[in-house]
Design a protein with these regions (language model features):
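Pyridoxal 5′-phosphate
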Residues: 1-181
Length: 181
């Protein structure tokens, strides 16, 4: 999620399975950006986050192989096929479902448009700062993520300049945003 580079997950899963390992894939960043084929890649567990595709915050999904004997995390009640007690968030579930339908049906079109915007952004940055380093530039990557370094330009100055040029950017990772380091 920092570089946008798409990892060779199918190869990783094949190696893990060869050694009898269970495989969990955090696909929060992938939904709506790359095709996820449960039949093609033999994940044991796959997790998704609704807020990454416009669904309400706090809703997600755990997709798991039904051959796995998964133990409930919270006992009581029959909710979520007996896997978790408590009232289900019906509005969140519905919102996630609707967002997933929308994003899955528009992934290819959206990715093509976003890729062209990404390429435009990179070209514009190169004209402003030819020394810019784009990490994973030649790799297979999602359309919406760029990791770059602007040598000799302080981060706060770069943020202000890019903001004035109508680009939405951040300095550092989302999980460290707003923290003093």
């Amino acid at each position: 999620n920092e570089t946008g580079v798409i990892q060779p997950i199918k190869d990783v899963v094949e190696i893990a399975k060869k050694y009898g390992c269970l495989v969990h894939c955090d696909a929060a960043q992938a939904l709506g950006k790359v095709k996820i084929d449960f039949a093609e890649i033999e994940f044991d567990f796959l997790t998704l986050s609704g807020h990454k595709i416009g669904a309400p915050t706090g809703i997600g999904a755990l997709v798991y192989n039904d051959k796995i004997n998964l133990a409930p995390q919270i006992l009581g009640g029959g909710q979520e096929k007996g896997m978790r007690a408590g009232t289900e968030n019906i509005l969140g579930i519905r919102g996630f479902g609707e967002a997933a339908k929308f994003i899955i049906n528009s992934t290819e079109k959206n990715c093509s448009k976003v890729k062209s915007l990404r390429d435009y952004f990179q070209e514009k940055i190169k004209t402003l700062s030819p020394e810019t380093i784009f990490f994973g530039e030649k790799a297979n990557k999602v359309a919406n993520t760029i990791l770059m370094a602007l040598p000799k330009i302080p981060g706060d100055l770069a943020l202000m300049k890019l903001d004035l040029e109508s680009f939405s950017v951040s300095s550092g990772s989302a999980c460290s945003s707003g923290k003093v380091s």
